[in-house]
Each structure stands twice: as C-alpha cells, then as structure tokens.
C-alpha cells in the first residue's frame, strides 16, 4: 500500500536509451497509467509481460500507458539494458521499460519511497488520470492458473474501464 498521506509516485529513471522518464512527462499526463515493478529474472513477471504487451497494443489508443520498472540482478545500466531489451524483444513490448536498479528491498524503497512494505515481484500499480495511485496488486496469476487467470483479466479490464471513465 501507499504510505500515509501520499498518493502519487515521484520516480525519475532512465529508459533503455538512457533518457530520463517520469510520470510528469507529457506522454503520461491526463492518462491512466499502469506501473509494473518487474525483473527479467522473475517467471511471474514474464507471464505478466506476456499479458501486458499485447493488451497495451490493443488498448493504448484509449488513453492508457504502461511503464515497466526493471529491477535487475546487478545495479549496472549496461548489463540491465541488455537483459531488459531481451525481455522487450521477446514479448514485443512497445511501452517504456526503465532501469530502476538492483533487485533488493533497499533498491525498491529508494526508487519508490511512497510505497509501504514492498512485498514481491511483479507488483502492479494502477494510476488514475490525476496521477493518484488507486490500486496496488502484488503477484500475477498467469495462464497456468486457469479460472484465476480468467478472473484476473476480467477484473483488470473492469478496473481500467472504470479509471478511463472518470
């Protein structure tokens, strides 16, 4: 959950081309934004990317954006650029994936001080058009979970539809 009295995220991180990206950028203003906290080493994150990449292609014109925050095995931009670019290529990801640092609890706390008790990868934050975090979901129930995955997709789309309608 978010820390008491805080509703938005202030990260400013490099994308894989080295350009700094934040939620204040023109591209994200007035849009619903999904922030996925991920690692290329995390199997459930790969399942989530496999869902989000085609979902984004089909829905981006509706005023919704996705940002991936990649926490990798090393706090090394060149190493992580390679691992995260492989992830982008494998799943055909068209949204920005940013290098957020090393995958450890301190790393996440440093990049996202607004989030209380980060508990695992992937964690997905749903942000409304005003920039407020409205929901945080930890974990991902992938296709192997059958009905749970169908329920997840339904709930995901209902949530995005309601945020877009505001």
Report each predicted region and the residues it spans.
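N-terminal "domain-start" segment that seeds a small globular fold
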Residues: 1-25
